[in-house]
Structure formats: C-alpha cells, structure tokens
Amino acid sequence: MFSSVNTCWTLVGAFLVYFMQAGFALCEAGFTRAKNTGNILMKNMMDFCIGTPCYWLIGFGLMFGGTGALIGGFDPFIQGDYSHLGLDIPLWVYIVFQTVFCATAATIVSGSMAERTNFKAYCVYSAAISLVVYPICGHWMWGGGWLQSMGFHDFAGSAAVHNVGGVIAMLGAALLGPRIGKYDKDGKPHAIPGHNLTAGALGVFILWFCWFGFNGGSSLSLSTDETMTLTGLVCFNTNLAAAVSTCVTMLFTWKRYGKPDVSMTLNGSLAGLVAITAGCDTVSPFGAFIIGFVAGILVVLSVEFFDNIAKIDDPVGAVSVHFANGVWGTIAVGLFSDGGNGVGKGLFYGGGLSQLGIQLLGLIVVDAYVLAVMFVIFKVIDKTIGLRVPAEVEIDGLDIHEHGLASAYAGFAISDANSAAMVPNENTDLGEDDASKASAKQMDAAVPVVREPAVIHDGIYDTGMHKVSIIAKLSKFDQLKTALNDLGVTGMTVTQVMGCGIQKGTSEKYRGVPVDTTLLPKIKVEVIVSKISVDAVVEAAKKELYTGHIGDGKIFVYNVTRVVKIRTGEEDFAALQDVE
C-alpha cells in the first residue's frame, strides 16, 4: 500500500529539483557575456528535454533495473518489475524524482563549456550522459551496485550528481580549450566578467531554495517520527553549511583580494550546498559547519588553481563548485559521519579509516570511469560534428550564429554601473558634494570640455544653436538628467556606449584575476540648445559628473547649422520647441 504523505513529499522534492534548471540557467547566463545568453538558455532547456526521454529509454533501467554489481538491467521504456526497490510510493513518482536528478548532472557541464561549444555537440553529449554515464555511476552508488554493497554513502548526490557532472565539466573544458582572449601568449589569465550579476545572484537564491527539495526530498518519506526528524536534520544541515560557506568565502576573498568578491561569494553558497549533500543525513550540525567552512575556502583556491595553474577556462566556476566540492563532500562523510542513518562512523567519530577508505575508493573508480567514457565521446564528437565553434562564431557570439538571435535583450534600457554612488535626495544629500569642494582647475581637468570654433568653414558662422554631447558614467545618468531638466532642457538623446580610456582599472578584480580591459560602459547624452546658455548646461553637467577621479567623463560642444522638425517642417529655433 502506498503512502500518500511520502508520495506527496517525493513529488514536491521532484518539482523543486526540476526548478533548479531555472537557477542554473540564470547563474550561467549572468556569469557569461550577453552575446551568448540565448545559447545558455537553450542549452539548459534542451539538456532536460533531451535527458528525460533518454533516461526513460534505458537510463532508469541501467540504474535500478536489477541488483547486479555493475549495471541494473536493460529495460527499455521501463516495462519491468521494480518491486526489489521496496518503494512505498508509486514507481512513476520515483521515476520522476530520479529523472530530475539525472538532468541536474547534465546541466552542470553546460557552464564550464559555455561560450565556445557547438550546440549540436552539446545535444549529443547531454544525451550520452543521461543514457549511460550517469545511470551506471548511479547504479553503483544508489541502485544496489558494488559500491553501495560495500557501504559507500552519498545521501543526495555529492558524488553521484555533482562530482560526476563536475568531472565531465572539467574534462570538457580542458578538451575545448580556453575562450579567445582568456590567456595571453605567456599564459597570463585575463578576467572575462559576466554581464549580469543580478541574474547570477537570483539563480543562486533559486538553487539554494530548491536544494531543500534536492536533499530533503531524498528521504522519500515524512510518514514517521524517524523520517520527519531525519528530513529536518537534512534541511538544517543543508542550510547551515551553505550559510557558513558563503560567509567564509566572503571573508576569505576580502582578505585575499582587498574587497569581498561578489561572484566568488555566490559560488561559495553553491559550494557549501554541494559539499553537504553527501553527508547531510549522517553528520551533526557541527560537522555541517566544518564542511561548509572548508567548502568556502576550497572554492576560491580551486578557481585560482584552474585559472592560473591548470589553465582550464571555466566561465562560471562549475568545476570548482561541483567537482572540487563534490569530492570534498564525499570524503567528509568518511571524516564526520556520526553513525546516523545506518552509515559507518567517520574517522573523527571513532570509525577509523574504514568509511573514509570506501569513500575514497568510490570517488577514484567513478571518476576514472566517467573520464574514460566521456573522453571517447568527446573525441568522437570532435572528429565528426566538431566540439568547438569556429573563432568567428565565438567572437560574434553564439546567439547570432547558432540560433539566429541578434540579442537576448530586446529594446533599450539604462543599466546601473557597478558603483556605490547614490542619487542625492533629501535623505542622502547631507552637505558639501565633491564638486563644491573642487577648484575650477580641478573640475576642468576631471571633466574636459571641447568646443568647436565659432567659424565652421567657408564663412559659415555660429547660428546660436549648439549640440552638447556628454559622455559620463552610467550611474550618473539620473543626476545629470535632473540637473538638465532643472535648466529647462526637456529633450535629449541617450545612448549606451563603450568608452576606451587610458585607465586600466587595475584595482578591479573578477574571481581574483585583475580586469585589464580598457572598454568601460558609458552613457552618451546629447542635447540641442539655443535660448538656454551653453555655459549653464556645461557647468551643470560638470557639477553633477565630478568626483575627482579618472573617468568622470567629457563634454563636447558643437555648432549646429540647421535643425528641421520632420512633423511640421519648422526649422532652427522653432523646430526645437516641443509643442503641438
């Protein structure tokens, strides 16, 4: 007889794990460049949609179709008898739960190979992961295979899901090679920041939320006092390890880089979640604290290792999050298990080296199998349809070449720069601003003004109409707009541009690597004035833009010889009046 409580809980867990696809999509899109956003979203959609029928075809049978040491059984389309699993929930509910886990392993690979992988190749190797790679590893650890019979423990997938996905991600990124521009000829890494940390952060929050289904749902039961207590411990340990890991990563990067690194801290959250997944049911909260603490440091050192020493270009840090911390979490069971939930005690709880040895053996064999099989698959793909896109496609962006998508972002929007500057208001304007403290000479140096001569050519003189073109930081737009409106300027043309200056931003770092690009996001504001004094516009702009630092902006003043309003045919001053 089936348990309705357990069935509902397992389905809730499955639905939460499915929603992790949204978290992965946002993380990967945010940590990569805008020109590849559509490709990232497409890959995260398709690995689930390809993996689902593949897992139904033979994957589930290989994983759970029997109790053989190496494989479960060959059961196409899940037609066999699975009573040996001893489930108190319907088989199809269990299949749904396992399917979303399989899809997660395939999704992990997408991030490390982002921005240069052939989309056809991605579809092929995602199918291979769901057909044979993940199911066979899963059988060894969860389906009654030889590792499970030895006592290997991985409650929710540090090894079976994250380590497997992470080791494939590492191999794939290594075989692909780095993105164009990631390393110079001397092997020095260059930071390639993601385009949208907001999306990346939202992805992390979604993943953290869904992890309660990933780990908590793996209990498959809430019908007894014991299983309710176990699920509560699992969820508490999951949250604690993630929170500790996040704090440690923030503090560690603050000490190491001089400032707390945002993207690395976000990865620190995921690192703690991955690391606690194997032992969340069998370690105490103190053990979870230590596991999260180590994960927070490990993810930073791992990113630096793969960037600077191994020269494996991983745009989103997937290898460091899932492989490095999947390994750590699996080993941690052999160190911190207190013997709960029928698991052998770890080294620090009087269990000796027995459980630790089993955990290490499992990792070595699983990773060796995955590396061997995926190496062959990647090489076959590379020799046939090609694993990597041509340089031209990579430079232009995969969106336009692979999907015919000019941009994943329609329309035009003003975005804020990564700046702590506040727009002054009655609550923030507390006194003297930077401009009022500066001398005229300082302001002229910080915000240069270039004026076109009054005589343009062939005796054509100043008409009294001028175009003022202002190049400034994105974060200053609202202040500048308000100041111009106060002068009576009601019409302006605004464009987002990239500025190339002499400053190299040497103090800025991304994942510990100095950002040395000279192209910086700017805003260009153009206004045409006649009755309003040009000097008043210039002085107002200088006052709002001035901070005293390189990059405050520039102002260009041009003579305008003629203006024509298309709607009415009016010219010059009359054309500048916005009336019906």
Language-model segments: residues:
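Glycine- and aromatic-enriched membrane alpha-helices
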Residues: 1-457
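Positively charged, small/polar-rich N-terminal and surface patches that mediate targeting and assembly
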Residues: 401-405, 420-580
